[in-house]
Amino acid sequence: MTDTAIIETLRTKLSIAGGRHLYAVLGSYPQLAKFSSKLLQAKTTEGETFPKPVSVNSGILASIPDQEFRGLVEDEARRPEPTAKHVAQAFEKFLRDTLLAKGLVVLERMELVFAYHLELNHLRTLAADDYRILLLLPGKRDRGKVVLFPEAGEATYMLPTNLIADNNLWELGR
């Protein structure tokens, strides 16, 4: 789909009051950057500008105090589970704080979420009624599945099929 078509469809869906509001746009990093620029120029049906995309990686790292972060980095190779648990807690806190403050949030740069195989259902649970989440994901559709980081070869990540409704998931044109 084109940037404009996705934005128009998104505007319509965001105007619906109730229900699940988890959306995603797939594309390459350059395509997502271009889409972000166009999204920032667009207006919602209420006449407001779309929010600037927020880096999930930065949000997670910012929520971990420096001293604690140093300890996690030093221990990660020997004990990866506590680090993953800590990153998961930081992700959930960042997500709740960001969403509650804004109502509509555009999330990008989520590599830490996938690197640590964090639970994604929090996104779906929180994106309901007055809270809306748009994910900008580096990926593509492939044989009915959503493949993230397709250039990574065997290190790709498959998005769970039931996470985002098919009609709330758009792929930028190639």
What are the residue ranges of the model-derived segments?
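Short beta-alpha junction loops
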Residues: 28-30, 59-61, 137-144
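Glycine-rich P-loop/Walker A and Walker A-like loops and their local beta1-loop-alpha1 context
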Residues: 1-47, 118
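Conserved nucleotide-sensing/catalytic segment adjacent to the nucleotide-binding pocket
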Residues: 64-105, 109, 116-125
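AAA+/P-loop NTPase substrate/partner-engagement loops
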Residues: 48-71
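Structural alpha-beta junctions
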Residues: 41-52, 125-134
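Residue-level preference for the first positions of well-ordered beta-strands
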Residues: 20-24, 102-106, 132-134
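Conserved beta-strand scaffold positions in the cores of enzyme catalytic domains, especially
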Residues: 22-24, 50-55, 156, 166-171
